[in-house]
Each structure stands twice: as C-alpha cells, then as structure tokens.
UniProtKB/Swiss-Prot annotation:
UniProt GO BP: translation
Gene3D superfamilies (alphabetical): Nucleic acid-binding proteins (2.40.50.140)
Quaternary structure annotation from Swiss-Prot or TrEMBL: Part of the 30S ribosomal subunit. Contacts proteins S8 and S17. May interact with IF1 in the 30S initiation complex.
Similarity-based family: Belongs to the universal ribosomal protein uS12 family.
Cited function: With S4 and S5 plays an important role in translational accuracy.
Cellular component aspect of the GO annotation: small ribosomal subunit
InterPro entries to which the protein is assigned, alphabetical: NA-bd_OB-fold (IPR012340), Ribosomal_uS12 (IPR006032), Ribosomal_uS12_bac (IPR005679)
Organism this protein belongs to: Streptococcus pneumoniae (strain ATCC 700669 / Spain 23F-1)
Keywords for this protein: Methylation, Ribonucleoprotein, Ribosomal protein, RNA-binding, rRNA-binding, tRNA-binding
Gene: rpsL
Keyword tRNA-binding carried by entry: yes
Name of this protein: Small ribosomal subunit protein uS12
Length: 137
C-alpha cells in the first residue's frame, strides 16, 4: 500500500482501454492524404479477396470471409454472416465491428442487405440481422 505522500508525488494511472475494432476509429482526408481520428459506427470498403477459412479447435467448418480495403485505406478481414452470399472481388460492402470467436484475426462483420451485399434468401426469423425483407403473406 503506498503512502499518501507517494500518491501525491506519483498518482495512480487509469487503465487505457484498447479498441476491439481499431479500423473504425480512423478516418481519411483524401485531399490532404492524411489519416484523421474520426471514428464511425460502420465503414464502406471494397472486397479484395473472398474465400473460406477454417475455425480454431475444437470447431470444424468453412467460414466465409472477405478481405476488405476500407475507405480509410486500411485493409481488414471481415466475416460474411448467413447462409450463402453474392460477394466477389471488387464488391462494395459495409462493415461493422464485432469479432468472430473461433476465427483468429477477424474483428469485423459485413452488413447483409447493404450496398452490393444481398440479404439472406428464405430467412423467416431474425431477418433484420441478415438484411431480408418481410415475406409476402
């Protein structure tokens, strides 16, 4: 336990919280070609690679992912949620934060139903998360 005098000389440091989705906290000024620290909830980007990835132990699957170059010139790996997708190279996508527990290095999700990404077909429940319109009665 420090004495009062020690705390006066050198106060306690508060913990610095690290961002879980750092690429969303960086903006880009294209006129000055300089990065700014303007954060945003989502970012637009262009898919540079679309493929599948195997998850960590003990899970087994082929998880769909896309490598995306964001509008702030940062390149990140993003997960494509839902069954089936229409993404290919040069597709324009919208990214949100949120990591995938069993895919190392994947810290972002692609928003379904926004920009070039189509919603999930034949989805009846939880449609808003997958960009699916309400089915006709």
């Amino acid at each position: 336990m420090p004495t009062i005098n020690q705390l006066v000389r050198k106060p306690r440091k508060s913990k610095v919280e690290k961002s879980k989705s750092p690429a969303l906290n960086v903006g880009y000024n294209s006129h000055k070609k300089v990065q700014t620290n303007v954060s945003s909830p989502q970012k637009r980007g262009v898919a540079t690679r679309v493929g599948t990835m195997t998850p960590r132990k003990p899970n087994s699957a082929l998880r769909k992912f896309a490598r995306v170059r964001l509008s702030n010139l940062i390149e990140v790996t993003a997960y494509i949620p839902g069954i089936g997708h229409n993404l290919q190279e040069h597709s324009v996508v919208l990214l949100r934060g949120g990591h995938v527990k069993d895919l190392p290095g994947v810290r972002y999700h692609i928003v379904r139903g926004a920009l070039d990404t189509a919603g999930v077909n034949d989805r009846k429940q939880g449609r808003s998360k997958y960009g699916t319109k309400r089915p006709k009665a």
